């Protein structure tokens, strides 16, 4: 009699859903107030002029304008700001 014993269950086979992080609006792009510019974990990018910081560190536009990325300060931090059009 050809029989096969039941295989043991595997301990793998789990993975978390991707969080879709990253830059959503790039430098020079026009944005409206409220548009999300960057979704991030921690402050990889810091909020500059006319940019708000959400509780999950999301950067969003406070006014309409163009997105500008810049590196400033002694620690070479990356800032995102909005310039009025």
UniProtKB/Swiss-Prot annotation:
Keyword annotations of the record: Ribonucleoprotein, Ribosomal protein
SUPFAM superfamilies named in the record: Ribosomal L27 protein-like
Classification via InterPro entries: Ribosomal_bL27, Ribosomal_bL27_CS
Keyword Metal-binding carried by entry: no
Record bears the keyword Ribosomal protein: yes
Highest taxon listed in the record's lineage: Bacteria
GO cellular component terms listed in the entry, alphabetical order: cytosolic large ribosomal subunit
Region (Disordered): 1-22
Xref: Gene3D superfamilies: 2.40.50.100
An MF annotation (GO) of this entry: structural constituent of ribosome
GO biological process: translation
PROSITE patterns in UniProt: RIBOSOMAL_L27
PANTHER family: LARGE RIBOSOMAL SUBUNIT PROTEIN BL27M, RIBOSOMAL PROTEIN L27
UniProt family annotation: Belongs to the bacterial ribosomal protein bL27 family.
Protein name per its UniProtKB record: Large ribosomal subunit protein bL27
Gene field: rpmA
